[in-house]
Amino acid sequence: MLPRLVLCLMLGWGSVLPAASVPELVLNNVNGPPYTNAQQTGFLDRVGPAAFHRAGLRLRLVQLPAERGLRDANAGIEDGDLTRIAGMENNYPNLVRVPEKLVDWRFSAFTNRHDLSVPAHWASLLPLTVGIIRGWKIAEVNLATAKKIVLVDDVDQLFRLLEKHRVDAVVYSREMGLWYRQEHGLRDVQLLEPPLESREMFIYLHKKHVEHVAPLAAALRAIKQDGTYARLYRDSMPYPLGGGP
């Protein structure tokens, strides 16, 4: 029989090694509150690691400008990107999409011009000067023929364009824009309804991690089926799942 000390050490090592050997993937994150925040209590701060854990992985998020994040993920500097629309692999061939949506984004217009008509689609913004975040490909493509596009690197710069009256409208996620407006007391900024477009958002991994794509998709489906996804949404988001204020 092994001495008790040796046995305890072996058991201790056995409990440490699996955790230490779990692969960690670093993904770029272009989200803001209420999806992700500095305290890591946002919806995607919680549902992302939950899915990765079920797939036998650890997730660490870093926040880079959207365009740089895509380039770095495609180059393998980071291991992927947390939320992008389908089709990114067409222009970033080293990225592989996890074929189970992570979340829905409602791309919306915000303005402090009270004379603007309500947009029902991207074409309604084409006669305007519009601010968008560099690297948000859906906005870059749909507004390519707009009167003028002003590109910025982050949400603070985006809404500053409105404050300085440099643009007629900006495009952002509906939920994140509403949170930002409330948090920063932007009383003159209004959300234009309905949203320009609702799109499914997906995790992308660099092709060197292709073996994790199927397990991650299965893990996402599992946490939706067992109620974990809906519970984390209720606990983290100020708006009902599939709804809004």
Write out the residue ranges for each language-model feature.
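Short helices/loops that flank or line small-molecule/ion binding pockets
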Residues: 67-79, 144, 155-175, 183
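A ligand-binding cleft/hinge motif common to bilobed small-molecule-binding domains
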Residues: 83-93, 168-190, 194-197
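Extended ligand-binding regions for polar small-molecule ligands
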Residues: 45-54, 113-119, 123-129, 203-239
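Extracytoplasmic small-molecule ligand-binding "clamshell" domains
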Residues: 20-94, 132, 152, 216, ...
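Periplasmic-binding protein-like
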Residues: 29-30, 103-108, 182-220, 239-245
